[in-house]
């Protein structure tokens, strides 16, 4: 069975992954059929680039993405777009829906970042209050 998965590259403690279509029996960093994208987890924010037409091709011929590959593909919006096409939605409606999806996704990302910043500030304030008392 063909799987869409990550192939590790980069150097020690600086991972960089290729998103590949590979035979499920092949080792993680072994033989693969095609490179269909890249993922850089060390970049801030994480950098994901995929060739949407090739990923769509492999998914349509039955390739199964691993959990991590699935979440990366989903984060790009490709699965949502493919689902709309499968339902028979017109290209114009797909374009408007994908723009709306991009807006919602940007808002979610911003909301997560602000929540993370608030938690960090609260933690610093608690540490400062704790050190002032002690």
Swiss-Prot record:
Residues 109-123 have a biased composition (Basic residues). SUPFAM superfamilies: Ribosomal protein S16 (SSF54565). Residues 105-134 are annotated as: Disordered. The keyword Ribonucleoprotein applies. Keywords: Ribonucleoprotein, Ribosomal protein. One of its GO terms (biological process) is translation. GO terms for cellular component: cytoplasm; small ribosomal subunit. Signal peptide: none annotated. Pfam families: Ribosomal_S16 (PF00886). One of its GO terms (molecular function) is structural constituent of ribosome. HAMAP family: Ribosomal_bS16. Belongs to the bacterial ribosomal protein bS16 family. This is Small ribosomal subunit protein bS16.
């Amino acid at each position: 069975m063909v799987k869409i998965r990550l192939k590790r590259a980069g150097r020690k403690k600086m991972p960089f992954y290729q998103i590949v279509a590979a035979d499920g029996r092949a080792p993680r960093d072994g033989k693969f059929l095609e490179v269909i994208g890249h993922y850089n987890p060390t970049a801030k924010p994480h950098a994901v680039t995929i060739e949407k037409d090739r990923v769509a091709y492999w998914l349509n011929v039955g390739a199964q993405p691993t959990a991590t590959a699935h979440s990366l593909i989903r984060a790009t919006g490709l699965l949502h777009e493919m689902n709309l096409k499968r339902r028979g939605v017109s290209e114009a409606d797909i374009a408007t829906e994908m723009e709306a999806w991009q807006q919602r996704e940007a808002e979610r990302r911003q909301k997560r970042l602000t929540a993370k910043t608030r938690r960090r500030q609260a933690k610093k304030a608690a540490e400062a209050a704790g050190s002032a008392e002690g």
